[in-house]
Each structure stands twice: as C-alpha cells, then as structure tokens.
Amino acid sequence: MDDESLSRLLKAAGDTTRRRILTLLVQEGAMRVTALAAHFEMSLNSVSKHIKVLEEAGLVTRRTMGREHIIAAELEPLRLTEEWFGQLKSIWDLRLAALEAALMGKDEDDERTGTDDKPENPGAA
C-alpha cells in the first residue's frame, strides 16, 4: 500500500461516524444508504458525505440497484493497514528487546563487579 492510500485510509477511519458506519456494515452486511442513515442522527446528505470518504479510501463499495445505492464494507484495505501496524509493532518489539538486553547486561555487570552506580551514603553527597 502506498503512502497516499494509507493516509486516505487512516484519515477515513479517524472519524467516529465513519468508523461506526464501517462497523455497522461489517456486522450487518451490505445496506442501502437510507437504511444506514437511519442509524444516525444526521441528514441523509451528511451520511452520504461520510460514505463518499470511505469509498475514496477503498473501505466501502457502492452498487446501484435502480434508484437504491447499496453500500458494502471492503476488508482488504483493513488487512493492509493491519500489516503496516504489524511492521511498526515488530520494530518496537525489537527495540524493546534490545533495551531489555542492554539493561540485563548492565545488571549482570553490576553483580559481577559489585557495583550498582548508587552512592554508598546518599546523604553524604
């Protein structure tokens, strides 16, 4: 996933209403725009604008049946985002493991030498 696509996706998912729309679609399956709007205390036009942002991010698709617009969740972009966050987590896990190893090594050195970098009489300083 390129940076621009990821940015659009994260921006779209960054809004509470859009996350609620996406969650509803995942839980209930594809829905008409009017049925989706019935779940929110806002105008049909406002819900449509949120859906448009989700569409642009690839998080939902729209198909038309006559005059009805049916909206469905698309989970593939979420999987790609999960992979990106997984990569970040791996980097942090490695950094934390290195920090832990460094701290454990210092503790072992202190035990061998009998030092712990603490003054013997803290009040004397």
Each model region followed by its residue ranges:
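C-terminal regulatory/oligomerization modules of transcriptional regulators
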Residues: 1-5, 24-27, 31-35, 39, ...
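Short, Lys/Arg-rich nucleic-acid/phosphate-binding segment
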Residues: 64-70
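Short alpha-helical elements of helix-turn-helix
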Residues: 7, 15-19
